[in-house]
Amino acid sequence: MARSGWKTAGLIAGAGCLSIIAIIIGGGIIATMYARATVRSFGDPNPQSVERRIALSPPPAEANPPGAKGEASRTAPLHVRLELQEGTFTIQPGQPGTELQVQGRFAPGLFELTESHSTDPTGAREARVRFHSKAPAWARFFAGIGNGDEDGPELTITIPRGTPIDLTLEVSVGRSQIDLGGLTLGDVNVTATMGEHRLDFREPVVKNVRELRFSNSMGNLSLEHIGNARPETINATGSMGNVTADLAGAWSPGSESNLRFDQSMGDLTVRVPSNVRVNADVRSSQGGESTNRTPALKQSDDPKAPTLRLHVTSSMGNARVIQD
């Protein structure tokens, strides 16, 4: 009787497990079919090549809105805003001109590339480029099950040299390779979220950048050759991710710059070149205890060496200031 009871219990348990598996498989099939129908409702899900030119040339003087300061509006830098989500993105300098060039490949039924232009009452102009998904993330996930589709969206944006701009860049959920070297930049504001992002200044900018602002969360951000931007000010914040900042580059001789890095829940590494003078203040907070330390850095003996006033704070993570 005991063996028969155990056998019956085993059969019942086995049948229950098979039922659960069948429900999961059936639910997955239904979810996949519904997701694919949802995706098709947005349009063509097949990737297509795209090439677009976006004019950055200033509007005619008579097009300035009433009350605008005509001369100021013609000479003020154009504000370029790039908002890029869910893809692999490359941003690079191009030949002199007055157009942004956008090239890439994506499914028009799943993603959308838009542009807009505006002028505020002061005459300041803005060009905005936005790339984002149209279909819900859950639908794209389930629709991709079983079809081996790994052809995600890719975009390359080329910024013309010689056009003065203030740049706002927001990149999220993806990968980015960004090179802003050789451009004419005023203020630069970069926000990177959820992904692997690399920003470089491979060659010196035309004129010193007034302010560099970086924000990184839930991902990794690598900053290379920051000295080639010759920034007067850097403000960088990071949380739930890692940040590496290389300060090498062609800093302006005799210049003074204020650099601030604030990091929480992640690692921060700041690499300092040997051809600058550095006043460093590094503060760390761990478990309710705060420490203040001054890293041992070699100071340049060149009387024209640039001076970097570096302030670093970290909490629930590790911050290092090192010298190559």
What do these predicted ranges mean?
Residues 2-112, 121, 134-164, 197-198, ...:
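Short acidic/polar N-terminal linker immediately downstream of export determinants
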Residues 74, 161-163, 182-184, 274-276:
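Short loop/turn positions at the edges of beta-strands in beta-sheet-rich folds
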Residues 119, 125-129, 151, 161, ...:
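Glycine- and small hydrophobic-enriched segments that form the cores of compact globular domains
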Residues 168-207:
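Right-handed parallel beta-helix
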Residues 92-94, 181, 271-273:
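Surface-exposed, acidic/Ser/Thr-rich flexible loop segments
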Residues 80-83, 169, 261, 282:
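Active-site alpha-helical segments that house and flank conserved acidic catalytic motifs
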Residues 51, 77-79, 86, 152-154, ...:
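Surface-exposed or flexible loop/turn and strand-edge residues in extracellular/cell-surface modules
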Residues 61, 101-106, 112-121, 128-146, ...:
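Short, surface-exposed interaction patches in beta-rich subdomains
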